Amino acid sequence: MNIDIVISADHIDEKRLINKTVIIIDILRATSVITTAINNGCKKVIPVLTVEEAKDIAKNSKEDIILGGERNALKIDGFNFSNSPLEYTKNYVEGKTVVLSTTNGTRAINNSFNAKTILISALINSKATAKAIDKLNEDLIIINSGTNGQFSIDDFICSGYLIDCLYNIRKDLELSDIAKTAHYIYMNNKDIESFVKKATHYSRLKSLNLEKDLEYCFQKDIIDVVPQYKDGYIIKSNI
């Protein structure tokens, strides 16, 4: 199994994704939100690029819609929820559709539509994602959403942890140089949150008093669910 990493949403080459399995990672916080919402019984998540598109879907839909997302880590005016996974509890999201728009994560998802399979991962479900990848048994591209188009160490080290979870299942992994680097960084910094504390995005969220979000997002493998993008929606994968 060949594994490569793309360092941000801006670095995605859509042609390269054709017929590939792709993993989207944005641990702070979009993929943590999506994983949490799906685990708590959300019917589906619709990832969109713009606030206007999200509001149009909510306006025209007959479904029970929750609008969620952020711009520059802040809740969008007129939306029900921000991009905090702690808001997407079972009593709010069960059986409902979440329309989500974020600065980085939903852009990475929307830029990956050419892929054969798109799975959503974060630290909170990495082992479950690794099991799904093993079942697919296909070459893999891990896409880091990044921060405003730039490299983000939090997504990168999460990629390294995901690779390590895969190594615990199978040994026939062929890593690109960047994938080897991500795995090396994780193996030498297994206390991920301590390593990431000086990162730009982490510091931004901490400055907004979002320590509880950070604490939640840096937990490993508390959820045994893998969301999958399919036909316009993100649902619970049956892989």
Swiss-Prot record:
Source organism: Clostridium botulinum (strain Okra / Type B1)
InterPro entries reported in the protein's UniProt record: ComB-like (IPR005238), ComB-like_sf (IPR036702)
Cofactor(s) required for function per UniProt: Mg(2+)
Stated name of the protein: Probable 2-phosphosulfolactate phosphatase
Entry annotated with the keyword Glycoprotein: no
Keywords: Hydrolase, Magnesium
Catalysed reaction, written as an equation: (2R)-O-phospho-3-sulfolactate + H2O = (2R)-3-sulfolactate + phosphate
Pfam families in the record: 2-ph_phosp
EC number, as in UniProt: 3.1.3.71
PANTHER family: 2-PHOSPHOSULFOLACTATE PHOSPHATASE-RELATED
Tree of life domain: Bacteria
Record family assignment: Belongs to the ComB family.
